[in-house]
Amino acid sequence: MQQAKAVARTVRIAPRKARLVMDLIRGKQVGEAVSILNHTPKAASPIIEKVLKSAIANAEHNYEMDANNLVVTQAYVNEGPTLKRFRPRAMGRASQINKRTSHITIVVSEKKEG
């Protein structure tokens, strides 16, 4: 069974927030997944939709798969490098602010007949 993959690395969204959206599309057909992402009011939705469309395009172009038969087989978010920033606080102190990034991976494959 052939698989097509798309990865977006070091995306400026917290992995915890991106996983909430990713859980909605895992195991779904790609058409259904795209419509779910269009109707999900989260900041991660357009980013994940772009990665999903890239995976679909990779499947069509590189492996000659039919887009109508594609299913999201794997969808996961890993933690990327953290950008560390500092916020000034009272009495000359400073608090560290972690700007988290994500590595978003989506794998699609053709669903089995039957």
Curated annotation (Swiss-Prot):
- What organism is this sequence from? Bacillus licheniformis (strain ATCC 14580 / DSM 13 / JCM 2505 / CCUG 7422 / NBRC 12200 / NCIMB 9375 / NCTC 10341 / NRRL NRS-1264 / Gibson 46)
Show the Pfam families listed in the entry. Ribosomal_L22
- SUPFAM superfamilies under this entry? Ribosomal protein L22
Assembly = Part of the 50S ribosomal subunit.
The protein's role, per its UniProt record: This protein binds specifically to 23S rRNA; its binding is stimulated by other ribosomal proteins, e.g. L4, L17, and L20. It is important during the early stages of 50S assembly. It makes multiple contacts with different domains of the 23S rRNA in the assembled 50S subunit and ribosome. The globular domain of the protein is located near the polypeptide exit tunnel on the outside of the subunit, while an extended beta-hairpin is found that lines the wall of the exit tunnel in the center of the 70S ribosome.
Tell me its family. Belongs to the universal ribosomal protein uL22 family.
* Keyword field: Ribonucleoprotein, Ribosomal protein, RNA-binding, rRNA-binding
What protein name does the entry list? Large ribosomal subunit protein uL22
